[in-house]
Amino acid sequence: MKRLTYLLCFALGTLTSCGASAARTAPEPEKAQSSDTPRTPTVRASDEAIQKYFASTLIDQKGALPASTLPLEDIKKARTQVWRLWAEANKSLSEDKLPALTPLSKESVAHSWLLTPEKYNGESFKAVMPFYYGSKGDKPEAGYPLYLYLHGSGEKKGEWSTGLALALSFQDSPSAYFIPQIPNGEGVADGQLYRWWQKSKLEVWEKLLRQAFLSDQIDPKRIYFFGISEGGYGSQRLASYYADYLAGAGPMAGGEPLINAPVENLQHVAFSLRTGYNDTQFHRSELTGYTRDALQRLAAQYPGYYKHFIDIIPKYGHAIPYQHTTPYLSQHVRTPQPKQVNWEDYPIDGLYRKGCYNLAPLKRPEGKERIYYQENILGNTVDLKINTVKYVEKKVSDWYTSFHLVLLYDKVYEPAKGGKLRIYLSPELLDLSKPVRVLVNGQQVYSGMVKTDWSHLVESCSRFFDPERLFPAAIDIAY
């Protein structure tokens, strides 16, 4: 396996706000104050205005956001309307589309997507990602569970074909599979582009999720990422980063330092990690143990959360039995709008998330790379703890001396200052007909009624592209 480079990673580029006629821009952050009862409903934002906004966000342009007061009793109908318009905008977008879902077999036809060119040491490399996309069994009423399988870092064509064979063998039917081949593998850029978490690949996972959610073939509450070896590293990192989209994740024969994949983010993700006891290269089995220990502590601290199945398998090395992961994952369903959220916001390959669950950073504190949000909604009170995170080296590998591999860190938290945050709200999270309180680090920053508006439905749709997270209300706070 190629030498690992443990880089901090990721933050996907989500969609920005964009234009429409007869519209206003998104509201400025609100200060702690009492608000009036929402005004009498006016004419809602037009379909044309919403479609223009969506069309603009899909090509990463900015503009005015359609806005109009939304009565509480119309939220369900409005969500349906907004999602329909989002689907129409995506259909009109000129881009590679997911192919029709056909039965997965040894003869499955390969498809491909053109990626953003990849860069290494000042050079640019064309990136084309071949993939298989197919189903097993009869489609459930809610749609197929979707598995993204990431292969290891051997000869990439052989690894890819092995991935297809494994997908066919796993006992997880009914299911759908997206099985990609790494665009630039061995022999290119010293192997340093053989990573599943780099920018061009992150754009693909965004696109896959967005298009899968629009498909009537895929269950949006049952998305799973898993992989083997290099694919194990990738799926562990992506699980922490994409936690709000996933029902489960299952890296195998991997094991990441937790700075690359903070376990705090896995509160609502069923997480399986299986590594051979004798798989000591790059400290894989040791790092798997540290992940197990951290999840055990969190599961004890938060009963009912942080479900995990971590196995350091006696007598096995890098090759292990692979058949146990997807049956475990398939038992779990995503929680898209939890009332309790732990989220460490961090960059991967220089990119930050634009939001997670119902939280969206509008401004990060200057000079602070990582922010840890802890949200607890009890009744109509949103209680937030917002802290900066500093990693302090605790244990460094004494085996690998040609590069600096930190195995364990201590974390130091301090109250964060100088940031702005958008908190999306919905009937699933609290009672929008009653006043809402927001606390940040024990201080009240908002108290009053929250106005429901078409603008929030539209903006949250373009930000998260998730049918389970169309938020009709939001509060912007400064801390």
Descriptions of predicted regions:
Residues 9-16:
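Bacterial N-terminal signal peptides
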Residues 35-65, 297-479:
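Alpha/beta-hydrolase-fold serine-hydrolase catalytic core, especially in secreted/extracellular enzymes
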Residues 2-9, 290:
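Sec-dependent signal peptide recognition
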Residues 143-213:
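Active-site machinery of serine-nucleophile hydrolases
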Residues 214, 221-267:
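Primarily recognizes the serine-hydrolase "nucleophile elbow" in alpha/beta-hydrolase
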